[in-house]
């Protein structure tokens, strides 16, 4: 969970990025489904005008101003986990907004069926794959660490250690290894940007998916650390936060989900607007405000949900 200063929600320094409008891309319109007992229980109450007014003053695309703009047009992007889900949509988003080249990385490049991309083999947990990718893709200017895994495991119980190790290897050590090898590549190409796909689970511990929360909290620390370490190299580091995204990874969850293209649009807009933190949906905005405003009350509600379902 992130360490936050003791301050009121109204004191946050947030602004909205200007969206890219080069091409009009339709977004999914989903009806609300019954909530499950994980992150869904902490979605903003859309039926409440009071909450809507409080959150409406700040866009669901909440971000924090930080660095220099990085242009998407004519960029050369590398996206991990690009064979499906959010990674695949990121590849399309880069191409549609004028990227000169997009490396679509996956464990099995044979699963990548997109025109206009350069498929490459990259298992983020394989050092040899990472080294080879860094050697081949020497022209990259934007790196998107998107590959991830979710096991939905409590911290204690059968299989929890295996789940924790798998999630840490993919969600933390994978991006760390990739950044370690690609930071010099980005610096040699003018600095560019690193985009880490995080989660609202980076900010708090939900006991029903605690091992995942631990891996995303570690990825949050990684993001903050490399942002400071690479700033003088001219490399922007952006963290992207969302609740459940409508992909295969969250197919088992019966709740309202965010369209992948919405996440991509807001991320690309943040690149061009000089932002270092992107809230990709309402749930990210809502949970961020609740955790910082009254963490004790937030965790009391989590405990209540946990006790009621056990």
Can you describe what each PLM-predicted range is?
Residues 95-113:
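Conserved glycine-rich Rossmann-like NAD(P)H-binding loop of the short-chain dehydrogenase/reductase
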Residues 179, 215:
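Active-site helix of classical SDR
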């Amino acid at each position: 969970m992130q360490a936050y200063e003791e301050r009121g929600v109204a004191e946050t320094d947030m602004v909205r990025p200007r969206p890219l409008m080069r091409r009009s891309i339709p977004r999914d319109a989903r009806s609300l489904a019954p909530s499950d007992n994980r992150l869904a229980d902490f979605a903003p109450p859309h039926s409440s005008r009071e909450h809507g007014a409080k959150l409406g003053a700040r866009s669901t695309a909440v971000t924090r101003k930080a660095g220099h703009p990085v242009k998407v047009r004519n960029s050369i992007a590398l996206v991990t986990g690009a064979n499906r889900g959010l990674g695949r949509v990121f590849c399309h988003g880069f191409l549609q907004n004028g990227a000169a080249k997009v490396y679509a990385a996956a464990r099995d490049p044979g699963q990548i069926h997109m025109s206009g991309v350069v498929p490459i083999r990259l298992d983020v947990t394989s050092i040899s794959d990472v080294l080879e990718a860094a050697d081949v893709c020497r022209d990259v200017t934007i790196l998107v660490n998107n590959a991830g895994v979710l096991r939905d495991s409590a911290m204690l119980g059968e299989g929890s250690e295996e789940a924790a190790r798998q999630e840490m290897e993919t969600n933390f050590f994978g991006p760390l290894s990739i950044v370690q090898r690609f930071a010099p590549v980005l610096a040699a190409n003018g600095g560019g940007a690193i985009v880490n796909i995080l989660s609202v689970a980076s900010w708090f511990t939900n006991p029903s998916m605690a091992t995942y929360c631990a891996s995303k909290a570690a990825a949050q620390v990684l993001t903050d650390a490399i942002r400071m370490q690479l700033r003088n190299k001219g490399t922007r580091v952006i963290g992207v936060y969302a609740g459940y995204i409508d992909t295969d990874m969250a197919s088992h969850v019966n709740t309202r989900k965010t369209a992948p293209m919405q996440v991509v649009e807001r991320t690309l807009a943040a690149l061009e607007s000089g932002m270092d933190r992107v809230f990709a949906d309402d749930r990210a905005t809502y949970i961020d405000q609740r955790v910082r405003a009254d963490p004790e009350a937030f965790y009391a509600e989590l405990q209540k949900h946990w006790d009621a379902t056990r």
